[in-house]
Each structure stands twice: as C-alpha cells, then as structure tokens.
Amino acid sequence: MKAGIHPDYRTVVFHDTSADVYYRTGSTIKTDRTIELEGTSYPYVTIDVSSASHPYYTGKQKEYSKEGSTARFQQRFGNFFK
C-alpha cells in the first residue's frame, strides 16, 4: 500500500437518534465530535435510521397488496381510456 493516500480507518461510534442505540464499528468517516464510551474516547456520528429503527428490520412496515393498488387504479382511471 502506498503511504499517505489511504483514509484513516478507526473505530467510530454511530448513534441512531430515533432508537437511541449506539454502534461501535470501524469507519473512515470524518467528524470533529467525540464521545466517551466505556472509558475510551471515540469519534461520534449521529444517524437518523439504522437496523434498530428502520421499519423493514423492526417488522413494523406496512404491507400493500397489489390487488388493492390495481383496483384503486381501475377505479380512478378505468373509464379514462374507454
């Protein structure tokens, strides 16, 4: 590897603010904020959505049936092309 061209890879804390969950993982993201976690200071980044708060992963997503969508379309625009 060439010296001086690669970003600084380090442990960073990501905070999902909507679920109040902290993730400590490796990243090259740049930030000026820090947080102390378990006695160690880490770079700190806030995020809005993670697997702890996204409806797909939490099982709270809404299911839409295709039949309902088709029927709704036909009801609105079915006579338009006749």
UniProtKB/Swiss-Prot annotation:
GO terms for biological process: translation. InterPro entries: Ribosomal_bL28/bL31-like_sf (IPR034704), Ribosomal_bL31 (IPR002150), Ribosomal_bL31_B (IPR027493), Ribosomal_bL31_sf (IPR042105). One of its GO terms (cellular component) is ribonucleoprotein complex. Coiled coil: none annotated. One of its GO terms (molecular function) is structural constituent of ribosome. Keywords: Ribonucleoprotein, Ribosomal protein. SUPFAM superfamilies: L28p-like. Pfam families: Ribosomal_L31 (PF01197). Belongs to the bacterial ribosomal protein bL31 family. Type B subfamily. Part of the 50S ribosomal subunit. This is Large ribosomal subunit protein bL31B. It comes from Pectobacterium carotovorum subsp. carotovorum (strain PC1). The lineage of its organism: Bacteria, Pseudomonadati, Pseudomonadota, Gammaproteobacteria, Enterobacterales.
